[in-house]
């Protein structure tokens, strides 16, 4: 997997040949003047998409639905009821606990989309024909009871990705990228002793040795 910014061009995305795209959550409003908007043509290139939280609102906004400021924020655990199952919600209990963290909400869904779940608001919508699925809640956190299964459904059943990821492959790729970027230069690293900086230190030292 690779994390890229919202303003990555469509050509750059296509060049990467992703099996799928996840539009992540965030604190912004799609209705703000400085909203982080992606190229709407991303929905027309045939790559499966999963929109999470802000990613759902973004999908609705760009494709002709409406997103409004909520009367009250929804933060914390919420009951999620599936109203129409789809490939991402396959095998998920009709009622389950999910984790919400949003203020804006989808008021009307775009043409071609169906509401697939609700809480106090529209909690999921999808255009199954185009392999576009969205969730207002966060499936990636442990508080969402069956969130891991939803992500698994998207990655393996919708995107048809293979279960071939290995930590050693990531280490080798990262070490190679560090060597290429650093070249003959030296690196100064501020080490806090936490997990992130410690892992970074090990990888950088493995890549460039005494240049660190």
Regions found by a protein language model. Give the residues of each.
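RNA-binding accessory domains that recognize and position tRNA/RNA substrates
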Residues: 1-23, 29-33, 37-45, 57, ...
């Amino acid at each position: 997997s690779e994390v890229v910014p919202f303003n990555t061009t469509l050509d750059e995305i296509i060049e990467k040949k992703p099996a799928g795209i996840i539009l992540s959550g965030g604190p912004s409003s799609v209705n703000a003047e400085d909203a982080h908007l992606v190229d709407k043509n991303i929905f027309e290139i045939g790559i499966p998409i999963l929109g999470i939280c802000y990613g759902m609102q973004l999908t609705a906004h760009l494709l002709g639905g409406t997103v409004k400021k909520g009367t009250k924020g929804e933060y914390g655990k919420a009951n999620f009821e599936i109203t129409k199952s789809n490939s991402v919600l396959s095998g998920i209990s009709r009622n389950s606990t999910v984790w919400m963290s949003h203020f804006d909400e989808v008021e009307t869904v775009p043409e071609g989309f169906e509401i697939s779940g609700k809480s106090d608001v529209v909690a999921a919508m999808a255009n199954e024909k185009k392999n576009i699925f969205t969730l207002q809640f966060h499936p990636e956190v442990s508080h969402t009871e069956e969130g891991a299964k939803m992500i698994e459904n998207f990655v393996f059943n919708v995107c048809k990705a293979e279960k071939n990821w290995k930590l050693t492959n990531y280490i080798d790729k990262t070490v190679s990228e560090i060597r290429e970027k650093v070249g003959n230069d030296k690196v100064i690293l501020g080490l806090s002793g936490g997990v992130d900086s410690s892992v970074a230190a090990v990888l950088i030292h493995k890549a460039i040795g005494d240049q660190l």
